[in-house]
């Protein structure tokens, strides 16, 4: 492995994940890899605060989930260390009632986040389901960047 490789696994629910050491958290964050999510991160409000992300209360972004359910998220901006590189990114932040938050956190045993294709844009992602292994490797050759920004707007190349 090289310094910019991240190894992970497949959990019992067949979800690819990696563990990320992150300032502000005692234990590594469990980051589920979601190639159907074209943003960088999906986090909750508490995680956004611990990551010191700036979340604008009026920055509501409607999103249609893979389940076809519509949900609103806030947008938060901050600095995140990804594969040894500090990046300024925009995260989707869950909007939850206190009851929803309690129910979700009761189901978790660890801090969980979702990483999407915006973070994976300059990476090679290998998922080996039979071996239950995940490998994310940073590609050394520079790529110009994703053809869309973090909220799905077309970029000119």
Indicate residue ranges for each PLM-predicted region.
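Pepsin/retropepsin-fold aspartyl endopeptidases
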Residues: 1-157
């Amino acid at each position: 492995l090289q310094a910019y490789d991240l190894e992970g696994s497949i959990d019992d629910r067949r979800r690819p994940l990696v563990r990320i050491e992150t300032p502000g958290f005692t234990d590594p964050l469990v980051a589920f890899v979601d190639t159907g999510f074209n943003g960088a991160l999906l986090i909750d409000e508490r995680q956004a605060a611990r990551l010191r992300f700036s979340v604008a209360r009026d920055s509501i972004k409607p999103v249609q989930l893979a389940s076809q359910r519509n949900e609103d998220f806030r947008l938060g901006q901050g600095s995140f260390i990804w594969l040894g590189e500090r990046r300024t990114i925009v995260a989707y932040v869950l909007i939850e009632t206190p009851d929803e938050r309690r129910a979700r956190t009761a189901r978790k045993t660890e801090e969980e986040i979702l990483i999407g294709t915006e973070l994976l844009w300059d990476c090679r992602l290998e998922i080996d389901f039979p071996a239950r292994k995940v490998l994310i490797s940073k590609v050394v050759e520079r790529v110009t960047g994703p053809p869309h920004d973090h909220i799905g707007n077309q970029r000119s190349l």
